A protein has these predicted regions:
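Glycine-rich catalytic cores of cysteine/serine-nucleophile enzymes that process amide/ester linkages
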Residues: 3-4, 8-46
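Exported/periplasmic cell-wall-interacting domains
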Residues: 38-185
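FKBP-type peptidyl-prolyl cis-trans isomerase
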Residues: 1-4, 125
Length: 186
């Protein structure tokens, strides 16, 4: 799972640059989207930080706005799940633990971003780095067991590629059927 942490290289709307990489210290579920409460899955897709929790049982935590618009369409309608966080410690069921030092750094960066007036803090969650031989092997292994993953990951790939190419957060929309789409360039 990849949670890119980037900041603007300049104060204007210019490109981002990588400032840190945080390993996910524990996972539950398997590759693929979260679709219902209690499935142990970590969501994959395009999200935002929607809350700050300085009182977390896992040191500190940043809330992820799961379910988003796509999830509300494609997930279990009565019980899609929720309360997904990026947090400290090294245990989790459906969240993304990055350790205490990692969450301290990320939490402060997110607070600083919000204090500078940025209301939306995007978090794009991918199953892995979606390029190169490792990705090809990873995708082949998992889609052989679950062909629906190939169709889902095909929705994530254009935004992943756009960010890697342009170093700007791409605009992603949700189609009426819940599929992600890269918005056309303005």
């Amino acid at each position: 799972m990849i949670l890119p942490c980037a900041e603007r290289a300049r104060e204007d709307a210019g490109p981002f640059r990588l400032v840190a990489t945080y390993p996910i210290l524990a996972t539950s579920g398997g590759p693929g989207p979260k679709r219902r409460e209690g499935d142990g899955q970590v969501p994959e897709g395009f999200y935002e930080i929607d809350r700050f929790n300085p009182e977390s049982l896992f040191h500190l935590s940043l809330g992820v706005n799961y379910p988003n618009a796509a999830d509300r369409i494609r997930s279990h309608h009565d019980r899609p799940g929720g309360d997904i966080f990026i947090h400290g410690k090294n245990v989790s069921i459906g969240c993304a633990p990055i350790g205490d030092v990692g969450i301290e750094q990320l939490y402060l960066a997110a607070l600083d971003t919000r204090a500078r007036g940025q209301a939306r803090i995007p978090i794009h969650i991918f199953p892995a780095r979606m390029r190169g031989a490792e990705w090809i092997g990873f995708a082949a292994e998992h889609t052989a067991r679950n062909p629906a993953l190939a169709r889902f990951w095909e929705q994530l790939q254009p935004a992943y590629d756009a960010f890697e190419r342009d170093h700007l957060v791409p605009a992603v929309t949700v189609a009426p059927d819940g599929r992600y789409r890269l918005a056309p360039a303005p």
